[in-house]
Each structure stands twice: as structure tokens, then as C-alpha cells.
């Protein structure tokens, strides 16, 4: 089951005892999943959701809390509709329900954000508002670089109200307009986990966190492997470049090169991939890596000075792009 469906399934089974929180969830779900329609002069309340269990929960809550009967219609997948959808409709008592849930104000005008009693309610009401909004139009992506918990909103006022509810829960959420659609997005991994728990999807949070940890471990391992590979490549190229320069230095100096510098240089040429420490162990008598590095440095410096005096290519000329590519 996809993460979004897992969250919605768990939230739909959550038992909420607080009447105030249940009312806040219903109001939010109706606000984010549907709207008010005028049919034959009457107000009809509708909410369209993507899971049958959500529709059944909403229908039950509307009856338990307000005493109104809601009808559920199933819309089969067709055309642009990818999956089966469920429409919860209250027609006969639509206006009464709209007023009681706060979807209509005292003057009978549609509320553009969230109802005042939800916005000014308790922390449990803020959790319920998020639960209703997620059940209506929420999504949760798999953990990764672009992981996000997101809710599509009916308008900017509803988005800002949801951001405010998140703030009350200690979660940082941002309202954004994406391709003409208002959305509220939470991207931080810790914040997503906290919000899942706040809404009531603790089991899904544990699953999501486990996947996030596994992904982070894999990503760290890959980074370390890439880092090690890059270091090895750099070391190999540096050794090949040094060997080429030493070879050129021995050509430039010929018989004039001091024996102790010549022996260090020959070790570098004969063992191109070896580290300075390994060269020191191969020397007779053995030397420290600093002693090897010092002798090679003096050899190159002496050869470059002579090349400059004689007007010939120095040791750097031996290090060509083709040479490094082959390293």
C-alpha cells in the first residue's frame, strides 16, 4: 500500500472520543474535500474522497454529531478520473449542516478559510483539522530527497488556516501556489513524523521513519564509497604524475644527479602506484615517507632549474592530460 493510502487508512480507523475534535474533523474534511452547491434553491453539502472507509467515517460522524443522513455515491474510474471516488452528500438538511459545521457564517455566506470554532479551538481541534484536511486531499511521498507531506487546499484562506493549525502543533508548514492550486507543504523529515503522530497515524509514522532511516543509511554508504573511490583516483593520478615528472627529471639531469636523489627517483618510477610510505619501506636502507618525499622534491627542483637554464621543457611537461586519463 502506498504511503498516502496507509496514512488515510489508519486515520479512518482512529477512534476519537472528543466531540469537539470530531466536529473539527468533519468541518475540515467537508471544507477541503467538497463544497456547497445550490440545487433547486436548496443548499447541498458534498464531499468527494478517494477511499470508501473515509466516506463511511464521514457519513457516520455526520449522523452521530448532527443527526443528518448522508448518502454515499461511488464514482467508478473513467477518463481523467484515475481511481474510484466516493461522494458523500447531504441534500435535505444541507443548509442546517453547513451552518452547524461553520461552512456558512451567521449571515449565510460561505466561509473561505476554516470555521472560527476550529481556528480558535483546542490543540486537539487543530490536530483534528489536519486529520480532516489530510483525509480530504492529503498526500505523503516516500522518504527521500523530495519527501513531503502535502495537502491541496480549496483556496489561499484555507491554506493559511491550515498553516496556522500546524504552527499550534509545533510544526512548520508552508503555503504555496503550484500551477494555480493552493497547497500546504511540510518537507522536514522530523516535522512530517511529528505531524503524522499528531494526526493519529503513529503506526504509519514508524513505517515511514524506518524507510527514511534505511534510505539515509544507504545514501551515507554510497557517499562514503564514492568518497573513497574519488580519493583513490586522486591518489593514483598524483602518483602517476609524480612518476612522470621524476622520469623527466632523471632525463634532464643525466649523470649529474646525486646518487641519493637518483635512488629515490628510481623507486618512484619503478613503483608508480605505491604510496610514499611503501616507497620508504622498499628503499635500502628503509626511509620514512617524509625523507622519500623530501628527496623527490629536491630532485624535481634541481631538474626544473637546469631545464630553465638550458631552455628545455621542465618536469611539468611530462604530465599530460592523456597520462592522467589513463591513470
UniProtKB/Swiss-Prot annotation:
A single GO molecular function term of this UniProt record: DNA binding
A Pfam family it matches: WhiA_N
Described purpose of this protein according to its UniProt entry: Involved in cell division and chromosome segregation.
Protein name in UniProt: Probable cell division protein WhiA
Family membership noted in the UniProt record: Belongs to the WhiA family.
DNA-binding region, residue intervals: 275-308
Swiss-Prot/TrEMBL GO biological process terms: cell division; regulation of sporulation
NCBIfam families assigned to the protein according to its UniProt record, in alphabetical order: DNA_bind_WhiA
Gene3D superfamilies the record matches: Homing endonucleases (3.10.28.10)
Keywords on record: Cell cycle, Cell division, DNA-binding
Ranges for region Disordered: 304-327
